[in-house]
Amino acid sequence: MKTKAAVLHSAGKPFEIEELELDGPREGEVLIKYTAAGLCHSDLHLIDNDLVPRFPIVGGHEGAGVIEDVGPGVTKVKPGDHVVCSFIPNCGTCRYCATGRSNLCDMGATILDGGMPDGSFRFHRGGTDYGAMCMLGTFSERATISQHSVVKVDDWLPLETAVLVGCGVPTGWASANYAGGVRAGDTCVVYGIGGIGINAVQGAAHAGAANVIAVDPVAFKREKALELGATHAFASADEAAAKVAELTWGQMADQALITVGTVVEQVVTDAFNVIGKGGTVVITGLANPEKLTVHLSGGVMTLFEKTVKGTLFGSANPQYDIVRLLRLYQAGHVKLDELVTKRYSLEEVNEGYQDLRDGKNIRGVIMHSAD
């Protein structure tokens, strides 16, 4: 079958809209028709050469849609089911899934290769195999993906809203609640109010933090943070640190969550300095794995029992927390509709990412055609 998709052929180049051949589902696979796809900063890391995939690759790792067909052996979903995709597949049987850390599932080891778990590909053009970002390729009208990459959701939920819980919302929310361990009465600082950071703010507020301090140079993002749970918002780390010292009588913050688009050494240092004794720094944002971005005092870490940790997907469980967050949304405890700044067509994908770079949107969403 044919499908229209936004494709990257190399780093430093924009997405190109192409018509590709798409294979049908094999054993354990499903055919999905995407309704919506989120514009997440992680795809920009491919363009900026921070993450190096196998090219060419269909972009997009945040998606929601309807199952159109299933291959042999599929038991999780059936045609007609509404699903949200998880950019981390969950096999359920590897060491990490079996010990409750499904966000680290071994199937995720090849998500940048773009192929299926067996190394084969489902997108093709002119004899060339095309990969799919995180084995999903949500910037395509349709895709054939693993059943382990989908989570069934209630069919009365609007998919253009549910799509947000595929990556940014759970990653941010869980960075506060799980990785950060925010508790009622805590002081939590969030650096970077984008698609992940705004949800770290929501997560910290939901956990009952007394002070949720947002740091971002963009004024409208600070305003949105205050709207969705932040108690204070500042343009710089220095301003935030001064306020933390004032609010806590010098005790400093309990958590500092780094949710900037690209992690650099300075923001890690700022976060380390803003936490007090027993405090935790959570690094959620990405950077080029070959670059060193942490340079801290081991002595201070020991004497003050400070913790610096990384987290993938906020240490959440995709199969459980995607559904959980949608229930919280329906109950009014998590805001989703308010996150979307603008919706784009597939052909406007590059415009959407330029808006993201320019700080014009918190969450952009691609709406696929209904055909």
Curated annotation (Swiss-Prot):
Keyword Transmembrane helix tagged: no
Entry's Gene Ontology molecular function annotations: S-(hydroxymethyl)glutathione dehydrogenase [NAD(P)+] activity; zinc ion binding
Reaction catalysis annotation: N,N-dimethyl-4-nitrosoaniline + a primary alcohol = 4-(hydroxylamino)-N,N-dimethylaniline + an aldehyde; ethanol + A = acetaldehyde + AH2
The protein's enzyme class: oxidoreductase
Cofactor(s) essential for the protein: NADH
CDD domains, alphabetized: Zn_ADH_class_III
Pfam hit, one: ADH_N
Thermal profile of function: Optimum temperature is 45 degrees Celsius.
pH dependence, entry free text: Optimum pH is 7.
Enzyme Commission code(s) on record: 1.1.99.36
One GO biological process term: formaldehyde catabolic process
Annotated Zn(2+) 2 binding sites: 91, 94, 97, 105
Stated regulation of activity: Inhibited by trans-4-(N,N-dimethylamino)-cinnamaldehyde through direct binding to the catalytic zinc ion in a substrate-like geometry. Isobutyramide acts as a competitive inhibitor with respect to the electron acceptor NDMA. Acetaldehyde, AMP, ADP, ATP, as well as CuSO(4), FeSO(4), HgCl(2), NiCl(2), ZnSO(4), KCN, and NaN(3) are additional inhibitors of the catalytic activity.
Binding site for Zn(2+) 1: 40, 61, 167
Keyword terms of this UniProt record: Metal-binding, NAD, Oxidoreductase, Zinc
Gene Ontology, cellular component aspect: cytosol
Family: Belongs to the zinc-containing alcohol dehydrogenase family.
Subunit structure: Homotrimer.
PANTHER family assigned to the protein according to its UniProt record, in alphabetical order: ALCOHOL DEHYDROGENASE (PTHR43880), ALCOHOL DEHYDROGENASE CLASS-3 (PTHR43880:SF12)
Function description: Catalytically different from common alcohol dehydrogenases. Effective in oxidizing ethanol, other primary alcohols and benzylalcohol only in the presence of p-nitroso-N,N-dimethylaniline (NDMA) as an electron acceptor. NADH acts as a cofactor here instead as a coenzyme.
Protein name: NDMA-dependent alcohol dehydrogenase
Natural source organism: Amycolatopsis methanolica
